[in-house]
Design a protein with these regions (language model features):
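Terminal alpha-helical segments
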Residues: 1-141
Length: 141
């Protein structure tokens, strides 16, 4: 492991992830299910970018599952991310649908499932970050 973690950069991005997840929950509770799904995706994307940037790694792209692979996360969490990856564009882009609007295609169940997936991903990332900090501290002792 490298000898430096950028705590400020991690905190900057993880704070954004947390507030975005809260906004997703507000949208879900207000019936804006497509926006809740999109924001759950965004919250997870921000959290993995927190981890990658905090460890000095590239964080280019929007696929949470691919970004998690760069961070060497396990398959179970990557599979949750694959659900969220599908919410990046069609949740907000009317061109994604031949009829109707994005609002017509997302349910309460979709929204709360996306939020739960996002919570799991964020928790996993926060736990891995704490573990890295602990390892680095031990290396320095």
């Amino acid at each position: 492991m490298g000898s430096y973690l950028d705590e400020d950069e991690f905190n900057r991005w993880i704070t954004t992830a947390s507030s975005t997840l809260k906004s997703a929950l507000n949208d879900a509770e207000s019936g804006f299910y497509n926006w809740a799904c999109f924001k759950a995706q965004q919250a997870s994307e921000f959290s993995i970018k927190a981890y990658l940037r905090g460890t000095g790694n590239d964080s280019f792209g929007h696929s949470i599952s691919m970004l998690l692979q760069k961070g060497n996360f396990d398959t179970a969490i990557i599979n949750k991310a694959k659900k969220l990856d599908k919410y990046y564009i069609p949740t907000r882009d009317t061109d994604s649908w031949s009829d109707g609007t994005p609002e017509d295609y997302y349910t309460k169940e979709d929204a709360f499932d996306a939020i739960e997936c996002s919570r799991s991903i964020i928790t996993e990332i926060e736990n891995k970050w704490r573990s890295l900090k602990s390892e680095l501290k031990k290396e320095r002792e």
